[in-house]
Amino acid sequence: MKKVLLVDDEPSIVTLLAFNLEKDGYEVTTATDGAEGYRLAISNPFDFIILDLMLPSMDGMDICKRLRQEKFDTPIMILTAKDDELEKIIGLELGADDYMTKPFSPREVLARMKAILRRTNKAVPAEPVATAQPEPTEDETEK
């Protein structure tokens, strides 16, 4: 089972993402402030990190930068309300593997995470995130 560290200080986002990740078979560890997230990241083997930027005690950019300076190669996705182009560029240059902005779709987070994991040494099999079929049109339901 793949292990994901989710670092975000918004309880509703933590609940939503943890639910969807666990439903998809991931083991999720959560942290609600930057210092706790950093401590967990360096002391536990995670396959993936989802990281907010605006966190109490240590911001996400600092966490990402420090992890990369210390040669941690765990894939990192920044998930934040900061949608400024410069913030995105800085986050990616500091070592994030992806940068998504809030609001977000949990299905898209999962799809992006799986794509990154497939291309790293943390490989997972390619499985569709959504298997839902389109709703039948009125013409199809009358047949």
Language-model-derived ranges and their functions:
Residues 3, 117-143:
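Short, Lys/Arg-enriched segments at the junction into DNA-binding effector domains
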Residues 14, 56, 70, 84, ...:
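The feature encodes the CheY-like receiver
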Residues 15-23:
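Charged docking surfaces used in two-component/phosphorelay signaling
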Residues 25-33, 40:
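Short hydrophobic/Thr-rich beta-strand motif most characteristic of the beta2 strand and flanking loop
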Residues 33-36, 59-62:
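Acidic catalytic/metal-coordinating carboxylates
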Residues 44-50, 55:
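Active-site beta3 strand of CheY-like receiver
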